[in-house]
Amino acid sequence: MALVPTPVVNEGPMFAEVDMGDNSSTPTVRATVVQASTIFYDTPATLDKAERLLAEAASYGAQLVVFPEAFIGGYPRGSTFGVSIGNRTAKGKEEFRKYHASAIDVPGPEVDRLAAMAGKYKVYLVMGVIERDGYTLYCTVLFFDSQGHYLGKHRKIMPTALERIIWGFGDGSTIPVYDTPLGKIGAAICWENRMPLLRTAMYAKGIEIYCAPTADSRDVWQASMTHIALEGGCFVLSANQFCRRKDYPPPPEYVFSGTEDLTPDSIVCAGGSVIISPSGAVLAGPNYEGEALISADLDLGEIARAKFDFDVVGHYARPEVLSLIVRDHAVSPVSFTSTSSKAESSPK
């Protein structure tokens, strides 16, 4: 493994860890997970930062680049949005207004720019965003191909804890796995990865490169990522932000509840981004040192070698005993009868 120095970004150290594949008999894919902080409440500046990071990854030959959960729009760590049981504050509502303003429409101009970036640097891009759909927000992952096309999205189906007051719930219509020249790529966000039925649905779609954007920097997260790699016989790419208090607006504009003693340099999210092989081997990371590009060459032959032992939806399945139904249609709270239906019911 080599450490490749890169320019300083936002006064933080940044480097790439590269694990070079040694098996030339099967295809390899160079993948990079980005560990960096959002520029909070400044979506245009965050997009500029994303492009700098994407360009840097591409310069090292990355073919697939994965960004953290909520990189565009921001993960509002430490905020309560003024909520307690039976009460909401005016300050919290204003905080939500600002957060809503930082989110992006899908499709929309920011999506167009991300697509153009993917095409410019010839990479497949997996980007964590906060999606705005009217006045409901979703924690979403967007997928782009190396030709600059937007492929689609995954909406987080189960926000965690207080996330549920600011994010809506995705439905079964956005659990995609894309068949690409690099392999079959999909994503689950943060603690969705602890949902065994969601994972099983993705395994059934043949996922080979399993992307796990997250906001969880605890050591125990690594155990989950290793388990998924072994269970699914897939590569796991987990990208997390590395944030200090100074990466968020200063108080009183932004307050970390219960941690008012933080200094500007206090670490509030320590990263831990990692790349793991289908055999459970750590290929790169976890990194807890600062902003970084963490890369590895993925030997796609490892997938078949792992599946020889364990194929969770194939030869190791028992569908006559255990099975799963996935309701993968879009769900809307309001349905309107069509014009044709109205015409059929009209008097002649």
UniProtKB/Swiss-Prot annotation:
The keyword Phosphoprotein does not apply. It is an enzyme of class 3 (hydrolase). It catalyses: a nitrile + 2 H2O = a carboxylate + NH4(+); 3-cyano-L-alanine + 2 H2O = L-aspartate + NH4(+). Induction: Not induced by abscisic acid or by 1-aminocyclopropane-1-carboxylic acid (ACC). GO terms for molecular function: cyanoalanine nitrilase activity; nitrilase activity; nitrile hydratase activity. Residues 29-300 form the CN hydrolase domain. Highly specific for beta-cyano-L-alanine (Ala(CN)). Low activity with 3-phenylpropionitrile (PPN). Not associated with auxin production but may be involved in cyanide detoxification. Belongs to the carbon-nitrogen hydrolase superfamily. Nitrilase family. This is Bifunctional nitrilase/nitrile hydratase NIT4B.
